[in-house]
Amino acid sequence: MSLRLFSSESVTEGHPDKICDAISDKILDALIAKDPEARVAVETVVTTGLVHVVGEIRTTTYVEIPALVRKTLLEIGFNSSDMGFDGSTCGVSVAIGEQSQEIAQGVDTALEHRSHDAEGGAELDEIDRLGAGDQGLMFGYATNETPEYMPLPIALAHRLSRRLTEVRKKGIVPHLRPDGKTQVTFAYDAEGAPVRLDTVVVSTQHDAGIEQEWLHEQIRTHVVQHVLDEAGLSGNLADTDYTLLVNPSGSFVLGGPMGDAGLTGRKIIVDTYGGMARHGGGAFSGKDPSKVDRSGAYAMRWVAKNIVAAGLADRAEVQVAYAIGRATPVGLYVETFGTEKAPVEAIQAAVRQVFDLRPAAILQELDLKRPIYAQTSAYGHFGRTDLDLPWERTDRVEALQKAVAAAQQSQ
């Protein structure tokens, strides 16, 4: 049997880039909680002993950004200079400007409304008033290889990262520090199905003087085996023959912002599908939902998941594209990789009929103008069985099935 190896990685909330994502999204949530119409684009940079917060905001409220930064760092676990970073004493600089008026006018009044106001005519749908916050393309993906409709490698990598953080915070494994990464490799058969766990890599920051052999066994028992058992993979896709590598480079004492500088938006593959699907390039964290980089990608996951949940395909990838200041998408594309159970043209027609992908409609349908974003800043934005996220709902299954049946009858 011909097998191919596919790998995906995850990182913990103490990874420098994820620290930045968390800070940016904490600021976003604090603003949206007080001002649902806030326009936010916040970027964070962390380095040894210092946090920079920059970006553009338009809002009617105020939040104490330095206090939010410090609280976030302490919640993650950077609370002592002994580990190279302390949220209580680090420097925090803030350089926030106002959203560009040119961008604001295009988003507040979409091209459709501006053209209508100039030419007159019948009254337009109010959903057409909000233009896309930028041009760009977004992808959504779903597969039936896991109950959460996610690729197995990234789903397992995220579970391992979450568990690594859990055993640290609960003291189940002592001497761990916040920074960490996981990576999972599965063997796939010619039909594209995962058949065997091949390799697991866990790198975790730890206190000085820890024996790596002891740490290896702690991670095997309390992290890897725990997750495999919980996921129902032990003795199934994961027998005892897989390779486990724990801190393969040796000691990992120097981590977090002291080990590497971090930046918002640098873990876009970790945030999405672990490389199993394409990515439009736009990051999520620190962006309010008028930015289609975020809301468009969430909507595409919603679409793709409902396609697969409806039994219309085993795998689905959906692309949407927008022009800045225009409400109506400029493109929509459905790919099912030969796994479709109905003609792709019928599925695509059904998607157009069932889902309104104008930015204002997405905000309304998914109820995105609320503080739900900080919880997604680590361990993935999709397939989160531990969270109730609106884009994970399979509430359009029946409508899609009916629309596909109608489209086939009309052909």
From Swiss-Prot:
Binds 2 divalent ions per subunit. Binds 1 potassium ion per subunit. L-methionine binds at E56, Q99, D260, K291. Residues 99-109 are annotated as: Flexible loop. It holds the Pfam family S-AdoMet_synt_M. ATP binds at H15, D179, G180, K181, D260, R266, K267, A283, K287. It is found in: Cytoplasm. Mg(2+) binds at D17. Gene3D superfamilies: 3.30.300.10. It catalyses: L-methionine + ATP + H2O = S-adenosyl-L-methionine + phosphate + diphosphate. One of its GO terms (biological process) is S-adenosylmethionine biosynthetic process. The keyword Transmembrane does not apply. Transmembrane segments: none annotated. One of its GO terms (molecular function) is ATP binding. Its EC number is 2.5.1.6. InterPro entries: ADOMET_SYNTHASE_CS, S-AdoMet_synt_C, S-AdoMet_synt_central, S-AdoMet_synt_N, S-AdoMet_synthetase, S-AdoMet_synthetase_sfam. The keyword Metal-binding applies. Catalyzes the formation of S-adenosylmethionine (AdoMet) from methionine and ATP. The overall synthetic reaction is composed of two sequential steps, AdoMet formation and the subsequent tripolyphosphate hydrolysis which occurs prior to release of AdoMet from the enzyme. Homotetramer; dimer of dimers. PANTHER family: S-ADENOSYLMETHIONINE SYNTHETASE. This is S-adenosylmethionine synthase. The lineage of its organism: Bacteria, Bacillati, Actinomycetota, Actinomycetes, Mycobacteriales. The gene is metK.
